[in-house]
């Protein structure tokens, strides 16, 4: 399931984050990928343990924790601390797939990468090119969202970032381990939850809504790994 999560950050939050990270030290993005990814990756990033990146990353995770659409879709259990990248002057990242398991920097924990997240920190009119292209069984999907919006998609997807030919594309990216590893099951739970919320707004907590809510939680109880 690929999902647009709007307004993760307010316009004011984006401005403050950009002020903070634009003046930070950026390094070659190849430092964070394996040999295969390094062949097709041309960008810059904040270092993984950058104090600036860690501080801003916590602000992003706090915002996500209060975003009901994200929580419903991702059913998050564990997060990779958000990273930050910058593309300009023709920089790009060719087709690749994210690693299935990553070590969480600064800890002894690992994370199964169920979901990939890209949070846009540049407005679309600030740069040319730079679309995130995600390939699945239905074809290729190009994504270029307003600053503060995020795209959520299965980490198993092959994807790339098109060359940025003008301006700068700045974003945050990270991975989520979900309570429900299977994308199909997670998608069913998301659709059920969204429909329950819509019906509840119209009908209130009637007997049928309570029954459907019970079915949702029974399925989650059966499928969740916590």
Curated annotation (Swiss-Prot):
Binding site for Fe cation: 96, 98, 159
EC number: 1.14.11.-
Listed cofactors: Fe(2+); L-ascorbate
GO-annotated molecular function: 2-oxoglutarate-dependent dioxygenase activity; iron ion binding; L-ascorbic acid binding
Start and end residues of each Fe2OG dioxygenase domain: 78-178
Sorted UniProt keywords: Dioxygenase, Iron, Metal-binding, Oxidoreductase, Vitamin C
Stretches that traverse the bilayer: none
Cofactor note text: Binds 1 Fe(2+) ion per subunit.
Pfam families for the chain: 2OG-FeII_Oxy_3 (PF13640), PKHD_C (PF18331)
NCBIfam families, sorted: PRK05467.1-3 (NF003974), PRK05467.1-4 (NF003975)
Name of this protein: PKHD-type hydroxylase mma_3618
Organism: Janthinobacterium sp. (strain Marseille)
